[in-house]
């Protein structure tokens, strides 16, 4: 779970995760030296729940992709069988994780996406029409170019088999920001590994600020073409 300025949301996210009926669940917080003190909040949570929560402190904020690579690498090194990616801003519903794990076990897929766009999935009522249109267009755009065959190509809520993460060589991924999610999916499809989806309701954050900058949007627009022509893999 990568964090940057999420001191208000992180304790709630951890509380929801630790309440799940999931055996051997471990929460790894990857904090990018948040100036609002998120790292200190994470350390307090780890001290209170030493067998459940741990913290990886990074010295600088250099992108969502780099934070995920650091966290996934640490999780694999520590012997995780399944790695779950999720945001700390409470937009991803933790209560769906058991269903994602069941789907991962029964479907034969190497990764399960928490999907806004399969039947039963939805986005927050607070989303304005233009944001919904942009999200729908982004998914259409990515699938048109890369033929991923999934409904939510830009999803950031995922449950991965450890072997799948090793197969796609996460550490070598070059993209950053939200395009990191697309590149992970693309590498999975190129390896012939199945992707499954379960419906979620994506909620709007109520605390803190979005990290979706113009730079991130431009990178996300260019990345599918780079992947298609082999310049990013």
Per-segment meaning from a language model:
Residues 149, 172-176, 185-201:
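Catalytic donor-sugar/metal-binding loop of nucleotide-sugar-dependent glycosyltransferases
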Residues 80-91:
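Short beta-strand-to-loop acidic/aromatic patch adjacent to the donor-nucleotide binding site
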Residues 1-15, 33:
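Active-site beta-to-alpha loop of glycosyltransferases that engages the nucleotide-sugar donor
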Residues 24-34, 56-57:
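Short beta-strand/loop segment that forms part of the nucleotide-sugar
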Residues 15-24:
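Short, acidic, metal-binding catalytic loop of nucleotide-sugar glycosyltransferases
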Residues 58-77, 94-178, 205-219:
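Acceptor/aglycone-binding surface of glycosyltransferases and processive sugar-polymer synthases
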